[in-house]
Structure formats: C-alpha cells, structure tokens
C-alpha cells in the first residue's frame, strides 16, 4: 500500500517516477518475471533494479528518494548498504528523502535526519526512541515524514 499508493499519486500528479527493485538477503538480483510480490500478494512491476541503477552511474540523479513502509520491505531497504549510501549522499546533497511508515528504519540505519523530527509506524517507534517524534515536512533537512 505504501508503495503502490505513493507511486500512483505521484504519477497522476505528473511526476516522472522510477521504481527500483531491491533484493533481500537471499533473493536474486532481479525478479525472475519482472514482478515483485508485495506482502499481501499484490504483484508489482519494477522499472529497474538496484544493481542496474548503480551500474548505470545514475543512482544520484533523482530529485527525491522515497522509502515506502511495510515491515518486510522497510527491513530489506534499511539493511541494504547501497540503499543506505544513496540515502546519505542524497540527503547530504539537499535532495528530498522521504520515509513512509516503517520506512523510517532506513533513516535510522543511514543516520539521516536523526537530529530533527521523525515519524513511523507504531511497530517501529521504539527503535526510533532517540529521535524527536513528529509529523510533517522538516524544511531545514529536506526530510519528508
């Protein structure tokens, strides 16, 4: 839901969106049939893979990076060193970095925006106990919460 609704709203708003497949620890570098199965069985197509994006040298070319929630996906993204590197670089370069729901775990792991307000799904709130818990846009750090 966090991915599909965000993707849909951005596309409807005229934003050029690229979805990226990020494999979990024991998953192939790209989905066999080009589809990712979300936690509730919804099949989603992806535009590229993290491996292809990094090899292209264009991983830092985007205006914004959005980390969707969902426990499984948020866990995968927050443990991927390449994703964390992209988040740190993007935030340092003043790009928008957004985390949705449990996606805030990626902010914690990347050490991005922890000096400002942060929000999350209640299931991961305790992991973010050292942060100021809030909702909204923190204009000083380009973090969308």
Model-identified regions with their sequence ranges:
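Active-site-adjacent pocket-lining segments in enzyme domains
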Residues: 1-26, 30-33, 40-42, 46-145
């Amino acid at each position: 839901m966090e991915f599909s609704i965000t993707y849909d709203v951005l596309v409807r708003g005229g934003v050029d969106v690229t979805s990226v497949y990020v494999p979990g620890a024991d998953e192939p570098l790209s989905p066999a049939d080009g589809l990712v199965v979300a936690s509730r069985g919804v099949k989603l197509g992806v535009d590229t893979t993290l491996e292809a994006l990094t090899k292209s040298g264009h991983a830092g070319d985007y205006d914004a990076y959005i980390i969707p929630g969902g426990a499984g996906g948020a866990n995968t993204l927050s443990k991927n060193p390449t994703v964390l590197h992209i988040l740190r670089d993007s935030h340092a370069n003043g790009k928008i970095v957004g985390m949705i729901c449990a996606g805030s775990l990626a902010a914690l792991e990347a050490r991005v925006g922890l000096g400002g307000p942060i929000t999350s799904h209640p299931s991961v709130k305790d992991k973010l106990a050292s942060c100021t818990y809030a909702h909204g846009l923190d204009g000083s750090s380009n973090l969308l919460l």
